């Protein structure tokens, strides 16, 4: 027999079951795949949603490596939760239609294309799951330092670059530290462009005149602005500068010589920033450095702009211009002193010959030899610019010696008379 009132209880229970079933379907619809356009899936939404959880916009070109970095970052933020090694990390990961979820360790999961997966399965040495033998090693937050890869892309760390190389089966290397493009690429391109420009002999000859006119213009502008007398020249500058160098050329030297040592080094010469307009500016100043010591003295600076240069410096400039124009190796290069005149000894490095000259460069007969002649004994300098061999006249020498002997005899006779002999 049926208990009384059982039919009344069955109807409410049936209704409750129907309502629960409907709620379960609705919940399953929310948690499962969204019906309709598959592009509305969470996996295609931009990674901005992974930071805020609210802002979401369409972005089908997501970086797999960067997504992996974000997931690892979220996993690290959940450090309070105990690590559950029984759960598969791919349970909550949804991949696109042509990709498969692959677990790496207990907390990491990545979406890899089916073709790459099949390619890795064919290679027995590779393992898909994390471990000591895993090729695609995990990356940690402590290793973040952006680098530029050989493929032209910027990676958040070297580990990310190696991981991308592992995933894409490509050979990638670090081109430089920091984001792309590398600074060396830009500097190399500019250096190549500057080296492509060649300076002819006429260019070097005309550049000195243009610089002199430019210095004169700068000095006139400085006078008008009242700053010409603000910077006084060093005490030794006026003494070291020649008479023809105390105009705009000497004024420019005092402006450039910030150290006050009466020399212009490469840093001080770099203040004349005309490389963009004068491609021969550096070769010109290199030709001024006759000593090749990396700096330009006051004399070298003045001689660079002299219309009439001393003989040795003039020949040196002609030789350098010929080398720049024709590029002839083995050309004799004269050795000049600080005043622009020839040194006593000149040597041809290509032949190994050395000889003695005067200050005007005239070779003294019989002094050329293999080795180093003693030009100090051969050449006698008199005055500032005169030179010549110390020839002696034997007849005059004998006459002078005879006169000296007669004077000595007379002196001895006088001393004898003082003795007081009585005849």
From Swiss-Prot:
Region forming the signal peptide: 1-22
Tissue: Brain specific.
Gene3D superfamilies reported for this sequence: 3.30.60.30, EF-hand, Thyroglobulin type-1
InterPro entries for the chain: EF-hand-dom_pair, Kazal_dom, Kazal_dom_sf, SPARC/Testican_Ca-bd-dom, Thyroglobulin_1, Thyroglobulin_1_sf
Annotated function: May participate in diverse steps of neurogenesis. Binds calcium.
Occurrences of domain Thyroglobulin type-1 (ranges): 309-375
PROSITE patterns documented for this protein: KAZAL_2 (PS51465), THYROGLOBULIN_1_1 (PS00484), THYROGLOBULIN_1_2 (PS51162)
Location of region: Disordered: 387-423
Keyword DNA-binding assigned: no
UniProt KW Lipid metabolism keyword: no
Composition bias, Acidic residues: 391-423
Subcellular location: Secreted, Extracellular space, Extracellular matrix
Name the UniProt record assigns to this protein: Testican-2
């Amino acid at each position: 027999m049926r208990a009384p009132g059982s039919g009344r209880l069955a109807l409410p229970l049936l209704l409750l079951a129907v309502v629960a079933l409907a709620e379960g379907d609705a919940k399953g619809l929310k948690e499962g795949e969204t019906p309709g356009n598959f592009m509305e899936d969470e996996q295609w939404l931009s990674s901005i949603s992974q930071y805020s959880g609210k802002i979401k916009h369409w972005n089908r070109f997501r970086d797999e490596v960067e997504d992996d970095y974000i997931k690892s970052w979220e996993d690290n933020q959940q450090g309070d939760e105990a690590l559950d090694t029984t759960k598969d990390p791919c349970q909550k990961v949804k991949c696109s239609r042509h990709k498969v979820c692959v677990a790496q360790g207990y907390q990491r999961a990545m979406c890899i294309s089916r073709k790459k997966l099949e390619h890795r399965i064919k290679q027995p040495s590779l393992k898909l799951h994390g471990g000591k033998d895993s090729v695609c090693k995990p990356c940690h937050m402590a290793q973040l330092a952006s680098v530029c890869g050989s493929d032209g892309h910027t990676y958040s760390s070297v580990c990310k670059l190696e991981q991308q190389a592992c995933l894409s089966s490509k050979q990638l290397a670090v081109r430089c530290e920091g984001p792309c493009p590398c600074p060396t690429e830009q500097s190399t391109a500019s250096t190549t462009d500057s080296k492509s420009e060649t300076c002819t002999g006429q260019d070097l000859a005309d550049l000195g005149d243009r610089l002199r006119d430019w210095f004169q213009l700068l000095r006139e502008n400085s006078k008008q602005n009242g700053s010409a007398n603000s910077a006084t020249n060093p005490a030794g500058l006026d003494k070291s500068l020649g008479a023809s160098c105390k105009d705009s050329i000497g004024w420019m030297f005092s402006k450039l010589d910030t150290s006050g040592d009466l020399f212009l080094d490469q840093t001080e010469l770099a203040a004349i920033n005309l490389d963009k307009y004068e491609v021969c500016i550096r070769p010109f100043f290199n030709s001024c450095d006759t000593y090749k010591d990396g700096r330009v003295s006051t004399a070298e600076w003045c001689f660079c702009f002299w219309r009439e240069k001393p003989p040795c410096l003039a020949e040196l400039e002609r030789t350098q211009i010929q080398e720049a124009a024709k590029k002839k190796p083995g050309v004799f290069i004269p050795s000049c002193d600080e005043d622009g005149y020839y040194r006593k000894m000149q040597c041809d490095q290509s032949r190994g010959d050395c000889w003695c000259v005067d200050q005007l460069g005239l070779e003294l007969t019989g002094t050329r030899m293999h080795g180093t002649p003693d030009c100090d004994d051969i050449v006698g300098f008199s005055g500032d610019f005169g030179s010549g061999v110390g020839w002696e006249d034997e007849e005059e020498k004998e006459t002078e010696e005879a006169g000296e002997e007669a004077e000595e005899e007379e002196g001895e006779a006088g001393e004898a008379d003082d003795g007081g002999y009585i005849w």
